[in-house]
């Protein structure tokens, strides 16, 4: 899988939605592996739900999205509702700081940092298996580590 952010260069040079679509279209046509689009505030580029859904429906290999921004759960919920079966991989990001809310919104996984994946894995597995209470219990145990990591 190839994970990519939208094109940007500093605070002032950003593509519009047409340019973003064309960027990912060219990549989709050039590779034969799945593409995950990373929607992160670091880029300063806003990726609308409509644009993400359009790319999932129209571009080969684009069906996974890593959402890491304020209001991730809300955006994940809207993305899943709008995109339906075209959205195969809605993922949580940001070191799993909002993991439970994002799983509740329909995230199918997370892409945390490399610090504690073995501790995060059971949270996701419990939640996806319908054992939310067990997931929340495990998450509560590791949340101090996640908070510590986010402050480094």
Locate the predicted segments by residue.
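Active-site beta->alpha loop and helix N-cap motifs at the rims of alpha/beta catalytic domains
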Residues: 1-44
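Catalytic alpha/beta core domains of metabolic enzymes, predominantly
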Residues: 26, 41-152
């Amino acid at each position: 899988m190839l994970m990519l952010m939208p094109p940007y260069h500093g605070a002032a040079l950003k593509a519009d939605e047409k340019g973003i679509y064309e960027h990912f279209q060219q990549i989709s046509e050039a590779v034969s592996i799945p593409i995950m689009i990373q929607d992160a505030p670091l880029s300063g580029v806003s990726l609308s739900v409509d644009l993400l859904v359009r790319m999932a429906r129209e571009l080969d290999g684009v069906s996974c999205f890593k959402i890491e921004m304020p209001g991730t759960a809300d955006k994940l919920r809207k993305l899943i509702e709008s995109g339906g079966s075209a959205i195969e991989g809605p993922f949580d990001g940001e070191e799993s700081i909002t993991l439970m809310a994002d799983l509740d919104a329909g995230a199918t996984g997370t892409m945390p940092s490399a610090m504690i994946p073995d501790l995060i894995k059971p949270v996701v597995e419990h939640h996806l298996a319908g054992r939310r209470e067990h997931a929340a219990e495990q998450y509560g145990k590791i949340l101090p580590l996640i908070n510590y990591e986010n402050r480094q």
